Amino acid sequence: MAHLVWMLGENGEEKSFENPNELLPLSRLEEIGVLYWHLDPKKSESEEELTKIRRERGYSYFDLTEICPDKLENYEEKLKSFYCEHIHADEEIRYCLEGSGYFDVRDKDDKWIRIWIKEGDMIILPAGIYHRFIVDSNNYIKLMRLFIGEPVWTAYNRPQEDHPVRQEYVKNVKGDTGFALAAH
């Protein structure tokens, strides 16, 4: 299982920065409530594992999306929207079936952590975490998006410190309660 997670520079604007100075352990993601799995979309065992994850976490709906100039209408406009720092009121669950891209998430000190997801990587971003997304230099990613119930994809652009979901997230990440984590 290969994962690539690293800190971005002070300004956090390295849209295509692919050469990290120092890789971070997955435990840095767990500290902020981000879950990670690696499944091989070409193996049946991974389908069984995905079914188990969906059942245990209540993900009853999924769809597929391809982010590339030929497949996504208003591609440049959508990329700008994805890259604008935001939160969601629900978890954001993404399973990479093909291609690759970056999810940037804020750590406890409000610094950017970059997660380079590639084929087989599945991540869950907790509700209320500031994040953004951008494709890498391959300019293509095919994702399975999973949801609890009917899909809701409302982005709340930063600042959202008064949003109840953001307040709950901050309480969990900085407080004593922490997150209930179950990934591998």
Swiss-Prot record:
Provide the residue positions that the database annotates as binding Fe(2+). Answer: H86, H88, E92, H131
- This chain's protein is named Acireductone dioxygenase 4
**Main EC class the enzyme belongs to:** oxidoreductase
GO BP: any one term: methionine metabolic process
* Presence of keyword Cell wall biogenesis/degradation: no
Q: Which Pfam families match?
A: ARD
Q: Could you confirm whether the keyword RNA-binding appears in this record?
A: no
Q: Which InterPro entries match?
A: ARD (IPR004313), ARD_euk (IPR027496), RmlC-like_jellyroll (IPR014710), RmlC_Cupin_sf (IPR011051)
Query: SUPFAM superfamilies under this entry?
Result: RmlC-like cupins
Q: At which positions is Ni(2+) bound?
A: H86, H88, E92, H131
Reaction(s) catalysed by this chain, per the record, are: 1,2-dihydroxy-5-(methylsulfanyl)pent-1-en-3-one + O2 = 4-methylsulfanyl-2-oxobutanoate + formate + 2 H(+); 1,2-dihydroxy-5-(methylsulfanyl)pent-1-en-3-one + O2 = 3-(methylsulfanyl)propanoate + CO + formate + 2 H(+)
**EC number, UniProt record:** 1.13.11.54, 1.13.11.53
Domain of life, per lineage: Eukaryota
Q: State where it is primarily located.
A: cytoplasm
Q: Please name the GO terms that the record assigns under molecular function.
A: acireductone dioxygenase (Ni2+-requiring) activity; acireductone dioxygenase [iron(II)-requiring] activity; iron ion binding; nickel cation binding
Q: Name the keywords, alphabetized.
A: Amino-acid biosynthesis, Cytoplasm, Dioxygenase, Iron, Metal-binding, Methionine biosynthesis, Nickel, Nucleus, Oxidoreductase
Of which family is this protein a member? Answer: Belongs to the acireductone dioxygenase (ARD) family.
Q: What is the UniProt remark on how the cofactor binds and its stoichiometry?
A: Binds either 1 Fe or Ni cation per monomer. Iron-binding promotes an acireductone dioxygenase reaction producing 2-keto-4-methylthiobutyrate, while nickel-binding promotes an acireductone dioxygenase reaction producing 3-(methylsulfanyl)propanoate.
